[in-house]
Structures are given as C-alpha cells and as structure tokens.
Amino acid sequence: MKILYSQRRFYHVETLFNGTLALSGRDQETTGFAWWAGNARLINLSGKLLGAHVAHAGLIVFWAGAMNLFEVAHFVPEKPMYEQGLILLPHLATLGWGVGPGGEVIDTFPYFVSGVLHLISSAVLGFGGIYHALIGPETLEESFPFFGYVWKDKNKMTTILGIHLILLGAGAFLLVFKALYFGGIYDTWAPGGGDVRKITNLTLSPGVIFGYLLKSPFGGEGWIVSVDNLEDIIGGHVWLGSICIFGGIWHILTKPFAWARRALVWSGEAYLSYSLGAIAVFGFIACCFVWFNNTAYPSEFYGPTGPEASQAQAFTFLVRDQRLGANVGSAQGPTGLGKYLMRSPTGEIIFGGETMRFWDLRAPWLEPLRGPNGLDLSKLKKDIQPWQERRSAEYMTHAPLGSLNSVGGVATEINAVNYVSPRSWLATSHFVLGFFFFVGHLWHAGRARAAAAGFEKGIDRDFEPVLSMTPLN
C-alpha cells in the first residue's frame, strides 16, 4: 500500500449521490488522507464543506434546545437555579426573561419558548446540512460564485472575514437592544437585592471602556473581568458591536495590504489555526469571567463566587456573634489580628480571619455596609437588613467548591450538601476546552507553516499499527 502524505494531490471525490456506486474518495490512496483526517477530504469541496458546517451548527443548536427543555422540565421554582445544576436557564434569567425582584423566577414559559425555538431552528439547519453534504453541488464556485472561494484568494478571504465580523457585531447589538428596549436585563445591583431593569444611561466614554483593557489582570485590578456595572457592560457591547461592523465593512471593501500578504499564511489550515487560537483566548477569558464576575454572571443564578462565599461566611458569623454580645470592632482573633474586622494593606476596614485574602470582593449584599474607609462599624451595628443575612448564609453554604462526584462544599464540612456550583462547571469546562483549542491552534499552525514552507509531511505513518492489520472488509 502506497502511503501518500502531500496535501497537494488528490482532490476529486465521488459520492454515492453523483450517479455512481463506486465508493472512491474514502480511502488513503485516492484522497491522500487517512480515515481520521476525514475533514481534509473537503478542503477543496466548498459545497460539501458548507454541508458539514451547517450540519455542525444544527447539532449545536439541537443541543441548546434539547438541554434547554430538559432544564425546564427539571426546574423547581422553590430552589435557586445554582442548586439544580442548571447552566442554560441562568443565562436566560440573566437576560431578564422570566425573573422578578431578587432573581425569583416568576414565569418559566419564556424558557420553554427558547427551547422550542432552538429545536425548530436545529431542524432547519439539520436539513440544510444533510442537503449540502449529500445532494447539493460538491463545489460552489461554478454555480454560485458569490459563495464559492479558493483558500489562496486573499481578497475573497478578507471579504468572508468581513461578513463574519458584521454578524458578530449584530450579535453584540442584540444584547444592547434587549437591555435598552426589550424589557431590560437582570441587574444584580438593583436596590434591595436585584431586579430586571432597562439600562438607560450607557457608558460610551472611550476612556472608561478602553480603560478596562489597560488595567492589570492581577489582584484588585482584574482587567476587563473587573467590570461591575451593567452600564459599562452594555456600553462596551455598543463599542464592540460598532468596531466589528465597521471592521467588517472595511474588510469587505479593501484588499489585504502588502505587509499582511507577506506576514500571514494563506491556506485553509492556517485559517483554522487562527480561529482555534482566537477561541482558546475566548475560552480562557470566559473562564475568568464566570469564576470572578458576579455582575455579568449574577450570584442569584450562578451561585456565589469563591471570594463571595468566603466573605459571606465571615459576615454570617459576625452577625451571629454580634447578636450574642461580641464587640466585633475590637475582638481579637487567635493570631492577634482582629477576629471579625481588620485593616487591609491600604487601610480600609475589612473582614478578618482567613477571608482577608478576598478583601477586594464587591457584592450587592455587602456594599450597602461600606463607608468611605471600608466596612462601616456603625452600619454593621445598626443597619444590617434581614435580606443581607439570609443571602450571605445561603452563599456561605454554597461555595463554588466540589468534586466530580458532586459532593460539594469544603471537603471537611460535616454539613456538606450534594451540590456543585455551575460556576465550577462553567469555569472548569471553559478552561479545559480553551486549553484543548490552544493545543489545536499550535498543531494546525505548525502544519500550515510547514506546508507553506514546502516540507509538510504530517505524522509519519510508516509504523502505524493499523497499517499491518487486515482490512475490515
């Protein structure tokens, strides 16, 4: 059996639907690609590749719709979302659907509608995917030149890039319109413990919006993850949507400059590597966002952040012991520092004990008790509201800790419940997937650069076990 490595050889693919029963184009000799590199058979078959992409979109949307309906079917309104292992309903609730003051679910019908709409959409996409994969033209260049392309055609590639950017910009504006005009979105900072509201006075100042990008990613700075109000989030989407749309128009109307033509590799595998790299970055950022940010991901739906649960514990015991007569302002802990309250490195009054490391935390249930110099002692003595006590006790017992077998909470805690926070799931999954995508980026970037340099070989398959096995048929 002759082993073929080069990508530059066999492109013609016959399928069952082209009027012949010969199954060529499925094996290594006729295509130059082994079974596990099946997608590579579609490199120059734009029609079939379109089918693969549309079918893939159908699978994604089907999962969204089916999982959405599954969560609706299992949802218990009396329990918080984060106790029920939900990951889709919290996103819908954050967008302001079906919830009222304090994040209480008042109507699950919008969630049902969302699931059904996704299922119907997935059927349309699935049909389109199967049609283009099996029945439609193998290549689009001849019959539909607008949708056809050659990977090396730099002008066409940047036009496609432009169209994608415009679609992304439109997506960003969908959130803006929902927040401004279509009922508003859930604001965890609304007075009295959160509510749905329309976002009226957006932050459009470039100094504020782009200032986030200039922040340090560490500690109390937190780069863009430190955003703590919806005005900045929606204003940021206005900026981002506008940049994407104008950038898209720019890329459609212009051809790549000489420096870009020289610097970049212009092949299908190179574009794949660029995309994987971008998605890896998004995955890592999303991981940090869902783990630390309780404005974009309200704790009412996703459970408290780690720092929030820790500070909630300190607050809960401060309330208890103060009721029992402790003077929380002067009580000394076992280390000689304040037992309940101490000073931060910059002089603010903060919670004492182990939670001192989380003194940066800002949370809606805690902020009303701060004054100009951190926590206000007189407010802690006179102004603590019952809703703040209830919420902190709830958050204290729902820290985003837990193991794969769903035994949640601190490992040594005797009252641990069968609970793992959606924050743990979402942060971990996005980190792990982001890492996998990053490895894929390195792999495909290396192959694309090697191919461009003219020595692309792929994996040396001379000693692959499957080659010495008897054929399956």
Swiss-Prot record:
[CaMn4O5] cluster binds at residue 367. The modification N-acetylthreonine is found at residue 15. Keywords: Acetylation, Chlorophyll, Chloroplast, Chromophore, Manganese, Membrane, Metal-binding, Phosphoprotein, Photosynthesis, Photosystem II, Plastid, Thylakoid, Transmembrane, Transmembrane helix. It holds the Pfam family PSII. Residues 1-14 form a propeptide. The chain crosses the membrane at residues 69-93, 134-155, 178-200, 255-275, 291-312, 447-471. One of its GO terms (cellular component) is photosystem II. The modification Phosphothreonine is found at residue 15. It is a multi-pass membrane protein. GO terms for biological process: photosynthetic electron transport in photosystem II. It is found in: Plastid, Chloroplast thylakoid membrane. Its main location: plastid. The keyword Transcription regulation does not apply. It comes from the Eukaryota. Binds multiple chlorophylls and provides some of the ligands for the Ca-4Mn-5O cluster of the oxygen-evolving complex. It may also provide a ligand for a Cl- that is required for oxygen evolution. PSII binds additional chlorophylls, carotenoids and specific lipids. GO terms for molecular function: chlorophyll binding; electron transporter, transferring electrons within the cyclic electron transport pathway of photosynthesis activity; metal ion binding. One of the components of the core complex of photosystem II (PSII). It binds chlorophyll and helps catalyze the primary light-induced photochemical processes of PSII. PSII is a light-driven water:plastoquinone oxidoreductase, using light energy to abstract electrons from H(2)O, generating O(2) and a proton gradient subsequently used for ATP formation. Belongs to the PsbB/PsbC family. PsbC subfamily. PSII is composed of 1 copy each of membrane proteins PsbA, PsbB, PsbC, PsbD, PsbE, PsbF, PsbH, PsbI, PsbJ, PsbK, PsbL, PsbM, PsbT, PsbX, PsbY, PsbZ, Psb30/Ycf12, at least 3 peripheral proteins of the oxygen-evolving complex and a large number of cofactors. It forms dimeric complexes. This is Photosystem II CP43 reaction center protein. It comes from Physcomitrium patens. The lineage of its organism: Eukaryota, Viridiplantae, Streptophyta, Embryophyta, Bryophyta. The gene is psbC.
